[in-house]
Amino acid sequence: MIKKKTYKPGSATIAQNKRARHEYFIEEEFEAGVVLQGWEVKALRAGKVNISDSYVLLKKGEAFLLGATITPLNVASTHTVCESMRTRKLLLKQREIDSLFGRINREGYTVVALSMYWKNAWSKIKIAVAKGKKTHDKRDSIKDRDWKINKDRIMKNANR
């Protein structure tokens, strides 16, 4: 009997958008499936994906991922056209799409991709409703992060 492949928590991550948490206030997160072609799945398994400039566009009651780059492998088939920046459809429930549509109609809100990961054998993407940060907000978050690191360092040394 074939044993199911189990991933450790955190090891199933394919790609992360670290810039998103720096440039946006994250309001609410959603999990969505991604419609992929065969060569794209192979490239994801090899880790050849970049979602740092990606965002979600809602059109006619459907959600699409734009700006994600999946680089084709050298051994990709020659009879298929490998377009690395193509628009990919996201699989969400209609209730979730309606919620996203209602939220992004507000001023300053957008939907960005946070991370892409494997869930069992399916490729999933974590998307979030986000509001853009101003420059002083970015500086404040950097100061808070640095203070937290210093505080942890001080507490670690104080306990010795």
Curated annotation (Swiss-Prot):
Keywords: Cytoplasm, RNA-binding. It comes from the Bacteria. It is found in: Cytoplasm. InterPro entries: SmpB (IPR023620), SsrA-bd_prot (IPR000037), SsrA-bd_prot_CS (IPR020081). PANTHER family: SSRA-BINDING PROTEIN, TMRNA-BINDING COMPONENT OF TRANS-TRANSLATION TAGGING COMPLEX. Belongs to the SmpB family. This is SsrA-binding protein. It comes from Hamiltonella defensa subsp. Acyrthosiphon pisum (strain 5AT).
